[in-house]
């Protein structure tokens, strides 16, 4: 662990607002208000991902609590899906474990409440078919009631988002869409206009996972997305070290880390680690390291 002392202050989480009349959204985006507060502090956000129900529900909730205590500002709570084609092997293994344990979509709202109560923003990251199956309107309502900030939808494009835009506007929820270097300028403009909270920039549309080196494609993409009109752009490109987090944080509004965190609870064969205490200690350590790296991004 990096033996550096750093001080930081979380942006205060906001209580959920009542549903607005159809077609009207709250003026302020929940996540954007946090990103704005952090920008004023001179640092990017630390955005961490963890799948609900992995390796079991109680441990996943404990892991999320550890992440928030160790410096995560915004937590993406993953909904396990049976065909996670855009996820790498680490998150695929974690999702399979959660599904095998019988995790249910309805339980994610308990995780949202906990993360919100612990002082971080809670986003749910989900493949769109899960939301459709649950019911878009009901999911939006329950998400808002739980204090959640919105959804990250990796496989949903703006053109097919009519019902989600309607319901997220009704309940004041954020809409986070993904873009890649392959996205056209017209696509970036359309996405930037429709998104609320931030636009999620990836190194490429496809499988996620940890990387040993960073390319400059994400930095170029961030510049293009800003030019397209997005006020906040956060980057997820397989960051796994404090140095990488600092590099990405120098140009992004938020650094998104997923596989490296989930990996802490998996053994070398892709199975849940038996010693949960040590696994959670490892999670706390890497979160602290990454948080320190992010704190150095603009110094």
Task: Label the predicted regions.
Residues 73-82, 148-152, 157, 199-209, ...:
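Glycine-rich phosphate-binding active-site loops on the catalytic face of alpha/beta enzymes
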Residues 26-38, 57, 81-93, 100-113, ...:
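Active-site-adjacent beta->alpha loops and helix N-cap segments on the catalytic face
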Residues 2-12, 20-49, 112-113, 298:
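N-terminal amphipathic alpha-helix/helix-capping segment at the start of soluble metabolic enzymes
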Residues 20-26, 223-231, 240-299:
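Alpha/beta catalytic cores of nucleotide-metabolism and tRNA/nucleoside-modifying enzymes
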Residues 88-123, 166-180, 216-233, 281-299:
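Alpha-helix-loop-beta-strand connector modules within alpha/beta enzyme cores
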Residues 46-62, 123-135, 174-183, 211:
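Active-site mouth loops of central-metabolism enzymes
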Residues 48, 67, 78, 143, ...:
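Conserved, mostly hydrophobic/aromatic
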Residues 58-67, 183-193, 235, 239-255:
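Catalytic cores of alpha/beta
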């Amino acid at each position: 662990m990096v033996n550096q002392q750093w001080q930081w202050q979380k942006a205060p989480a906001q209580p959920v607002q009542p549903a607005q009349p159809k077609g009207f959204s709250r003026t302020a985006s929940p996540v954007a208000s946090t990103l704005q507060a952090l920008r004023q502090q001179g640092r990017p956000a630390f955005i961490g991902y963890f799948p609900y129900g992995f390796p079991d529900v109680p441990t996943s909730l404990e892991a999320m609590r550890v992440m928030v205590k160790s410096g995560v500002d915004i937590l993406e709570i993953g909904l396990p899906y049976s065909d996670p084609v855009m996820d790498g092997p680490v998150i695929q293994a974690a999702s399979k474990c959660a599904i095998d344990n019988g995790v249910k979509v309805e339980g994610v709202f308990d995780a949202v409440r906990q993360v919100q109560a612990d002082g971080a923003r809670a986003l749910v990251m989900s493949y769109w078919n899960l939301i459709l199956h649950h019911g878009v309107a009901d999911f939006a309502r329950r998400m808002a009631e739980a204090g959640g900030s919105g959804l990250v939808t990796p496989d949903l494009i703006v053109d097919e988002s009519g019902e989600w835009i309607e319901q997220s506007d009704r309940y004041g929820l954020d809409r986070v869409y993904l873009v890649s270097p392959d996205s056209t300028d017209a696509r970036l403009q359309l996405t930037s206009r429709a998104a609320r909270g931030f636009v999620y920039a990836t190194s490429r549309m496809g499988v996620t996972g940890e990387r040993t080196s960073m390319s400059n494609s994400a930095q170029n993409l961030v510049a293009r997305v800003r030019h397209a009109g997005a006020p906040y752009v956060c980057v997820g490109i397989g960051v796994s070290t404090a140095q990488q987090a600092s590099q990405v944080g120098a140009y992004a509004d938020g650094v998104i880390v997923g596989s490296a965190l989930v990996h802490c609870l998996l053994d070398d064969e892709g199975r849940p680690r038996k010693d949960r205490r040590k696994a959670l200690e490892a999670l706390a350590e890497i979160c602290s390291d990454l948080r320190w790296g992010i704190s150095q991004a603009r110094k």
